[in-house]
Amino acid sequence: MVAVGVAGVALLWPLLAALVPGCASDLVTPVQEQVKPESSLLRPKVMIAIVARNAAHSLPYYLGCIDRLDYPKERIAIWAATDHNVDNTTAMLREWLKSAQHVYHYVEWRPMEEPRSYTDEWGPKHWPPSRFNHLMKLRQAALKAARERWADYILFVDSDNLLTNPRVLKLMMAENLTLVAPMLESRSLYSNFWCGITPQGYYKRTPDYQPIREWKRLGCFPVPMVHSTFLLDLRRESSRDLAFYPPHPDYSWAFDDIMVFAFSARQAGVQMYVCNREHYGFLPVPLKAQQSVEDESENFIHTITEALIDHDIEPSGHLYLSPSLQDTMGFDEIFLINLKRRLDRRTRMLKTMTSLGLQPTLTNAVDGKALNTSQLQALGIEMMPGYKDPYSGRVLTRGEIGCFLSHHSIWTQVIERSLQKILILEDDVRFEPRFKRRLQAIMDDISRTQLNWDLMYLPPPTPKKIETPSTSNIYRMK
């Protein structure tokens, strides 16, 4: 037996490596491949709860906003219920669910065809105890379904709320709060939160509300009440104790769904928050109990016109909507003045006019920025010596001259075509609530009183004569 020392082993190893090809490579550990990064996490699972009653007027735009949420549809479940309808809500919601269900993770549908009203209600806008009771049961059923399906969040959105910010879901989740509402805006100070609450659970005025509602203070604020639209994080342990129905055993406030839920949150130790860091959407001002579905529809039209000012909203593409009826309200023409380069305003105004049921005649405005001195001279336009704007004290700008020429071209058409009565709208007009009804009432009053008029500024309600030294037939509607 031959003994080989350590030195011999050291010499033998290179010799073996040279004599046996591949020996060294088989024994040496290969270099590790580059490690691939981990993939991103899937978005949390969300259930959106839709409870609709007599909402055929609002569903197309409401569902259009749901469609355009910037969130993976396969991570969203839809829970939808409707009941006690006198309009087309059930058929419309069913049509949307059938068409859209393939893009969502899961859809649950709870229609109730009959009865069409509650036995103890005065009308469709009245809230008797039976209606509150039924609504709370529906919302509790939605909450139960979300928990059973292991949803991470549930989003409650009233069927007349317009979520115009597509990122609202992501933004609210990023706040990392158990119960949070995006602040919604309306034509008044009304919104979907309270800053104060009385010992009896009713709304209480506080100095904190208006600065938040008017975006003078920005952030997320603890409040005693949120309603209409809010996001609940079901991953939080405290969320297990939240309930819409039945009311908490210690509950003694009025029988009202939002008050019952606010009390439940208080007892569960869940703080409600409202956020106004961005503009998230709109909601209509509530109507009175004696008002009708038609009043509600008219009220919602104004919500649409306000939303269209800064947002490009559309009805849901999953619904077939017959063309809306448009008319000129008895005017020979409704002229809409628009600068050709302001396509954004033209698009907004045409959508607004469609929602109002008005048929406009588009008129290209004279662009004051394109006017020069030689063009004005060629048109025979001269500034009156010493004239200054009565409000600003300055001479007229080219833009104001262009505005005048735009109107002048319409007046010329009136004479040439022998038009008797026209309405002129500029593309930055903002409509008042119930615009058509109020304008029709004004025109009826004028006809009844046989008012001799040439020009009126619109709106609003009661006529007040403008004192001018040269013209007696000009009125401003105030």
Model-based region annotation:
Residues 40-41, 64-75, 85, 95-100, ...:
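Short, acidic, metal-binding catalytic loop of nucleotide-sugar glycosyltransferases
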Residues 185, 229, 249-253, 259, ...:
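An acidic/histidine-cluster motif and surrounding catalytic segment
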Residues 144, 150-162, 420-430:
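Short beta-strand-to-loop acidic/aromatic patch adjacent to the donor-nucleotide binding site
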Residues 130, 143-144, 161-249, 432-478:
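Conserved catalytic core of nucleotide-sugar-dependent glycosyltransferases
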Residues 66, 83-85, 159, 340, ...:
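Conserved short acidic donor-positioning loop in nucleotide-sugar-dependent glycosyltransferases
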Residues 46-55, 62, 69, 81-82, ...:
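A conserved hydrophobic helix/loop-capping motif in glycosyltransferases and polysaccharide synthases
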Residues 88-152, 358-419:
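Active-site-proximal specificity loops/subdomain of glycosyltransferases
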Residues 13-34:
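N-terminal signal peptide
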